[in-house]
Amino acid sequence: MLGPTLVTDRLILRPPEAIDFEPWAAFMLDEESAKFVGGLTPAPTTWRGLRSMIGCWAADGFGMFSVIERASGQWVGRLGPWSPFGWPGKEVGWGIARAHLGKGYATEGAAASIDWAIDHLGWTDIIHCIDPANTPSEGVAKRLGSVNRGPGQMPPPFENAPINVWGQSPAEWKARKR
């Protein structure tokens, strides 16, 4: 395995593996799930995307985690730290499969990822790039203690996607947790 495994009350966060392809592809073929994470994506493109995320772990020592529900062992999404070239900052992002929305998994997993990014990667700022129409993700950001910093610009091919940059510093994160 290329990185750590983080365990929360209900989740296991681990670097993605080739065995995650089928649920990851189903996630990216579900219109509701994929709406704010690049849109519907055919399986061959998702295959390359999954391999790219695995490559982030190999090249950078971090990337999105696969999210596994502890009770069932089921893949329920992907989330975590990443910082693609041209991105507005170092992001902890999330995407949870439709069947598992509303369970608090994004907040629980993102909180563990923020802790790890601050403590192990030394990140000095954490952002979340959120489409203004994605009110559920805005709710996650608020629960995490992040604030809306205003509009941001994504790199190609997402340059026309509207986003607001939400974020906080490690000091703000740690103060909120007290």
Where are these regions (language model features)?
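Extracellular/periplasmic catalytic domains that process cell-envelope and extracellular macromolecules
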Residues: 58
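Conserved GNAT-fold acetyl-CoA-binding loop/helix
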Residues: 32-52
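Acyl-donor (CoA/ACP) binding surface of acyl/acetyltransferases
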Residues: 1-36, 55, 64-178
